[in-house]
Design a protein with these regions (language model features):
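Generic anion/oxyanion-binding catalytic loop in active/binding sites
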Residues: 33, 37, 97, 143
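Short alpha-helical segments that sit at the start of domains
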Residues: 1-83
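Amphipathic alpha-helical dimerization/coiled-coil segments
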Residues: 149-198
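Short amphipathic alpha-helical interaction segments
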Residues: 99-118, 122-126
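Short, solvent-exposed secondary-structure capping/transition elements
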Residues: 33-35, 61, 120, 124, ...
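Intrinsically disordered, low-complexity acidic Ser/Thr-rich regulatory segments
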Residues: 78-106, 140-142
Length: 198
């Protein structure tokens, strides 16, 4: 018996998960060619988000060049040389608008807040002035950039919990609750776009 493989409705397809990226970044592994940090010194939330978005852009550009290579194979043309591949990658990467990929800072902030509630990330005690404080020194209420690092609990948490911290934090809701929420959400219809083949 064969099962049809198809994605579930709703949600966004991503080459890698947000939780996985945050954990690997804060461990200092530099996931998806991002910057490597000192895990003991930690990093601030805005920097993690910035590197996550750039990594998503690189993954999308790489997928687009791989798609072009597949088209070249189908059309009987030779695949890109490594130099041509890199050139196409850089070209496509430069054309991706910053807000094209789906993650927005508010969503990331909520996700990070769940990690704080679970006790998986904690403050290091280091703070630095935020850009708002630098531009408007008279604005005392502007929050500083606070540095976070992974806690022992966060390092020991399994992958499935990192992939859905909201479900880990609120297990009483269960997957059926989230399925029902998605079912009741009315996604807007997209206008048809041009095919890549034309």
């Amino acid at each position: 018996m064969t099962l049809a493989l198809r994605p579930d409705q709703g949600g966004f397809l991503r080459p890698f998960g947000c939780g996985w990226f945050i954990r690997e970044f804060m461990l200092g592994h530099g996931p998806e060619d991002s910057a490597k940090i000192n895990p003991d010194a930690g990093t601030c939330q805005a920097d993690i988000f910035y590197h996550y978005k750039l990594a998503l852009h690189r993954a999308y550009a790489d997928d687009a060049v791989a798609w072009e290579n597949e088209e070249r194979i189908r059309n009987g043309k030779p695949i890109y040389t490594p130099e041509e591949y890199q050139e196409r990658f850089e070209h496509l990467l430069s054309r991706i608008p910053y807000k094209l990929t789906k993650c927005r800072y508010h969503s990331f902030q909520r996700y990070f807040h769940w990690l704080k509630q679970l006790g998986w990330v904690g403050l290091t005690g280091k703070e630095e002035p935020s850009s708002v404080q630098e531009v408007m020194p008279d604005y005392d209420d502007a929050p500083p950039r606070k540095y976070y690092r992974l806690t022992r609990k966060g390092k020991e948490a399994p992958d499935y919990e990192w992939s859905n911290p909201q479900l880990t934090l609120y297990p009483e809701r269960g997957r059926d609750y989230f399925r029902e929420k998605r079912r009741n959400h009315h996604y807007s219809r997209r206008k048809p776009t041009k095919s890549r083949k034309t």
